[in-house]
């Protein structure tokens, strides 16, 4: 395989994990970070102890504080940053890009102020002439397990399947299997909204409820995700795949999940401010719950689990009371029609 340079914007766990994969595949990953300490640690010690403790990075993984240096000559630019920084970083990237490039994003969330998916934010901020294609790389994955080279599957979603195949070729190896898909909307809706349901799964576990409750929450949560997704143009079949039910399962059932951990603390009685301070990392489901609350109301989409989680987060709703209200809702048939 011909060696390619790939820029990765973001020196967090996911950006660093993907850089490791690219180095394993004999490519040249360059991580752009904004903290001297982390950039220096990656370059000098070949570790990123804050985000991926105990992982030794290949020496081919490089990091820089210079955006221009990171993207110079890169075939692909991977955007691996929290959703609340997406616009700011994309404005910088738009200024820095000198030629059309394949853009990949791995950020899972909805912008609360606009209800825009991350690909829509990127398209607003980066000139079309500077984008060869925009690919969403998503699926059931924890960066920690990718960095440990445990078997993982992802999906590269793009309207241009040839561009998705380029991304597939750069990342696929014996540890990371990549599929392709043309449903960008579905991939982004599934990836963003599962974080809300994962908060709920953590709350359920924190309250001491068992597997029955969590299975019901996940199943009915996926019905809500699909309902909204189809309303905004997704293929319902996408939600049965890696970026839908796959991502939901891994995020709702693992202690690696920031959203599950945050929900678990909420279920045990801590308030949101305390939880976010203890986490010390972005919990995307909190921001997404705020966005989807208004979005679902605007579209008149029935999302009772999502609304209950919003109430716990932002209206000081008692978690047990929220569960009681969900269980006491008017009886209905399970069958969904889209």
Curated annotation (Swiss-Prot):
UniProt pathway: Membrane lipid metabolism; glycerophospholipid metabolism
SUPFAM superfamilies in alphabetical order: 6-phosphogluconate dehydrogenase C-terminal domain-like, NAD(P)-binding Rossmann-fold domains
EC number from the UniProt entry: 1.1.1.94
Source domain of life: Bacteria
Keyword Glycoprotein: no
PROSITE patterns cross-referenced by the UniProt entry: NAD_G3PDH
Protein task: Catalyzes the reduction of the glycolytic intermediate dihydroxyacetone phosphate (DHAP) to sn-glycerol 3-phosphate (G3P), the key precursor for phospholipid synthesis.
Name this protein carries in UniProt: Glycerol-3-phosphate dehydrogenase [NAD(P)+]
Provenance organism: Listeria welshimeri serovar 6b (strain ATCC 35897 / DSM 20650 / CCUG 15529 / CIP 8149 / NCTC 11857 / SLCC 5334 / V8)
Gene designation: gpsA
């Amino acid at each position: 395989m011909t060696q390619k340079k790939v820029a990765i914007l973001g020196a967090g766990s996911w950006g660093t994990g993907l850089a490791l994969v690219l180095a394993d595949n004999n490519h040249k990953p360059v991580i752009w970070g904004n903290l001297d300490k982390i950039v220096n640690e990656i370059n000098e010690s070949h570790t990123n102890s804050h985000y991926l403790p105990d992982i030794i990075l290949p020496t081919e993984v490089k990091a820089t504080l210079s955006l221009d240096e990171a993207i110079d000559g890169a075939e692909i630019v991977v955007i691996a940053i929290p959703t609340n920084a997406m616009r700011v970083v994309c404005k910088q990237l738009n200024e820095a890009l000198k030629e059309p490039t394949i853009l990949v994003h791995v950020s899972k969330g909805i912008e609360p102020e606009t209800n825009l998916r991350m690909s829509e934010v990127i398209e607003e901020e980066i000139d079309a002439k500077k984008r060869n294609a925009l690919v969403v790389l998503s699926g059931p994955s924890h960066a920690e397990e990718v960095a440990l080279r445990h078997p993982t599957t992802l999906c590269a979603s793009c309207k241009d399947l040839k561009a998705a195949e380029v991304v597939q070729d750069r990342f696929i190896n014996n540890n990371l299997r990549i599929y392709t898909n043309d449903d960008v909307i579905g991939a982004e809706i599934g990836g963003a909204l599962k974080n809300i349901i994962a908060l709920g799964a953590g709350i359920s576990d924190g309250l001491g409820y068992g597997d029955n409750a969590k299975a019901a929450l996940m199943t009915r949560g996926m019905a809500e995700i699909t309902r909204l997704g189809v309303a905004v143009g997704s293929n319902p079949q996408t939600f049965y795949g890696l970026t839908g039910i796959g991502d939901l399962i891994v995020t709702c059932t693992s202690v690696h999940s920031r959203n599950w951990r945050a929900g678990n603390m909420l279920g045990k009685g801590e308030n949101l401010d305390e939880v976010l301070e203890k986490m010390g990392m972005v919990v995307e489901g909190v921001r997404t719950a705020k966005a989807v609350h208004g979005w679902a109301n605007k579209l008149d989409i029935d999302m009772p689990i999502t609304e209950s989680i919003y109430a716990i987060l932002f209206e000081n709703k008692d978690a047990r009371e929220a569960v009681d209200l969900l269980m006491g809702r008017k009886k209905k048939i399970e069958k969904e029609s889209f």
